[in-house]
Amino acid sequence: MFSGIVQSLGTIISISEAGEIVTLEVQATEDFTKDLKVGDSVAVDGVCLTLTKSESDRMFFDAVPETLSKTLIKSYTKGTKVNLEPSLKFNDSVGGHIVSGHIHTTGHVNQVEIHGDAKDIVIDAGADWGKFLFEKGYIGINGCSITLGEITEGRFIVHLIPETLRATNLDNLVYGSQVNLEFDQSLSLIHISEPT
């Protein structure tokens, strides 16, 4: 589990394929990597991945076809900036909302408005996902816990403050950019339990 508060920005150093498995090499600060060990879970742009190898400031992760089909990983190239968060430990504070690292779908940026050092970003998740969105609720965007603004069917707006833009890759979003989306898990459970 994760808090949705990005702890560091990483950079994709290499991407390799072996059969259906894609291996990511991610560079981060040594301050971020120093306490990690093989087998630990790390959210990479909100995707829960298992650390398979660590070398100083480098981390290695494997992604399987199911993960590749639902996330941005398949579109990564060398130099891509990714949001990083280690998994929560007992007694850690939760500054955002609990996220699982299991991405539901990807959305695309429909509009970006700049307001001084802040930005309003409109994201289209698709009409089928509209039932998981409600104003002032939470959503995970590339692993960031964000409060939802206005909603129209499967399209929503988020208001991003300067600190969020400084600390995450959301500042790099432009029209047409793709993002990983994780909807509020409590809403997912409610809809799963509804009679059909």
Each predicted region: which residue ranges?
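Conserved loop->alpha-helix
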Residues: M1-S193
